[in-house]
């Protein structure tokens, strides 16, 4: 009888110890789980997250520019494909809109001529190509003649331009293309004027050049007399 009681007591003690041990193991496993997971993650290669902004209208870069450079004199519901080459972004006309680069066959977009914008573009950063044709202005252009014309030469090859008109041989290297050609022509790239009237463009430019030279010579002469 005494042996039986001792055996039952011993069994109860063992059962109690086993239950306590099991509970302790559960607690340890619960506490250690985050640390074990962290250690496992530490062994994995680091994942570098790169921010890649997704631009709307990726298939039509012109629409992305048009978000800020609003349409003018055109139905806002009209798409670029329906514009008939008369799309306006302020002063923009779309003769180039339906064209492709003859050298690579890619469609011409705003980016083709003006380049990609930076993240500061919307804050007013002057980070795109600007074509300035006022050769008599006092303000220095943002981009040199060579930089401006190289953009045009990406499609309009200099050799072919010289063959088409002798004036390109001289002027294309010293003057910006924009001084004679409109940037966003509706039809004719040559200031939108008729061929018979184009000579007036030459006369006006060279006349102004001679006038300014005469004024400069007069000032020099007056200084010499002082």
UniProtKB/Swiss-Prot annotation:
Protein name in the entry: Cytochrome c-type protein NrfB
GO cellular component, one term: periplasmic space
Entry binding sites for heme 5: 202, 205-206
Positions of heme 1 binding: 65, 68-69
Residues annotated to bind heme 3: 152, 155-156
Transport listed as a keyword: yes
Entry keywords, A to Z: Electron transport, Heme, Iron, Metal-binding, Periplasm, Signal, Transport
Superkingdom: Bacteria
Signal peptide: 1-39
Gene: nrfB
Annotated PROSITE patterns: MULTIHEME_CYTC
């Amino acid at each position: 009888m005494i042996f039986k009681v001792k055996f039952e007591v011993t069994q109860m003690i063992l059962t109690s110890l086993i239950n306590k041990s099991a509970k302790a193991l559960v607690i340890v496993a619960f506490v250690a789980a985050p640390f074990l997971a962290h250690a496992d993650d530490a062994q994995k290669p680091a994942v570098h997250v790169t921010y890649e902004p997704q631009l709307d209208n990726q298939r039509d870069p012109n629409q992305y520019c048009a978000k800020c450079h609003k349409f003018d004199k055109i139905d806002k519901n009209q798409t670029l494909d329906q514009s008939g080459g008369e799309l306006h972004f302020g002063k923009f006309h779309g003769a180039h809109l339906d064209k492709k680069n003859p050298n690579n066959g890619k469609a011409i977009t705003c980016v083709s001529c003006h380049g990609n914008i930076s993240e500061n573009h919307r804050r007013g950063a002057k980070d795109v190509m600007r074509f300035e044709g006022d050769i008599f202005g006092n303000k220095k252009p943002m981009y040199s003649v060579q930089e401006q014309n190289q953009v045009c030469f990406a499609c309009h090859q200099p050799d072919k331009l010289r063959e088409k008109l002798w004036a390109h041989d001289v002027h294309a290297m010293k003057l910006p293309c924009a001084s004679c050609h409109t940037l966003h022509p509706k039809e004719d790239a040559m200031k939108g004027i008729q061929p018979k009237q184009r000579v007036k463009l030459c006369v006006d430019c060279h006349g102004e050049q001679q006038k300014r030279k005469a004024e400069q010579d007069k000032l020099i002469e007056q200084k010499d007399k002082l």
